[in-house]
Amino acid sequence: MSNLEGKVVAVTGAARGIGRAIVKGFLAEGAKVVALDMSWTPSGLSGDDNDDYVKELEVKQEDVLISTVDISDSLSVERSYIAALDKFGTVDTLVNNASLRQRNLFPPTGKITTLETKDSDWEKMFGVGVFGTLKITRRFIQPMIKQNRGSIVTVISGGAMHTAIGGAYVAQRSGSSEGPYQSAKAATLTMMFYLAYEVREYNIAVNTLIPGNSRTTGYDEQNDARRAEGTTPSSSARISMRPEHMVPLTLFLADQDANSGVTGKCFDVTIWNMEHGLGSPKTWRDPDADPA
């Protein structure tokens, strides 16, 4: 029997992409899932063009709570939190996966320079990625504090933490043109490092993970737009992977606690998968993605 059998896991950004894969992964392990997202209506974009997934969750309604939430709104978060406790009585793990993608804020390519942005662009990005993550965490961590055990897993981005190889720590910008998005992820990473230290006394593990290059909702449209303007969508070294490559490490971290497990760490999912015999990016390659 899985250690996650019967555990209650809340997942933000659960309707599509990485969140969808994570929800399915937890259900396969026998966990009960609070699936949180701002919209459960298919967007029609690549990877999100039918409602079969929602129907699949509705069949498992004893083990799943589908909840519509705007994590940047405290009242919306509170409503979802109350609904989760009413249905399952507690929360054992929170997976912070929701964010505002740059391609949604600056369609269709997601590219913009710092001087081209407006204050409102940064406020929207940080409102979801940083303050939204804080609001949902601050609320859903309460049952974990009460039961003296829990786990917080937060998805960031490789662009949030870049270092040069050679011994000395040297910070550098991400290779992407996604300043607001990567800045929000960097702020979230720092926040989670501090939170891990602060809630260790409650036996709550707090960890972050960096996804590989994932083919998520709108990925194809973004690459088409970048190709149309003469920008190479991805280098030959980057392989577009299925969101499912995120699942094994997420499941592992969900079962951690601060006293006997791993906490305060940031993991590169691709490297972790290879180290644990789960394959290289080629193993997880999406056959329908752009050829690499």
Regions found by a protein language model. Give the residues of each.
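Short-chain dehydrogenase/reductase
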Residues: 2-88, 100-113, 117-121
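A short helix-coil junction within the Rossmann-fold of NAD(P)-dependent oxidoreductases
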Residues: 29, 87-88, 101-105, 139-151, ...
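C-terminal helical subdomain
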Residues: 208, 226-292
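Catalytic loop of short-chain dehydrogenase/reductase
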Residues: 101-104, 116-119, 151-201, 213-214
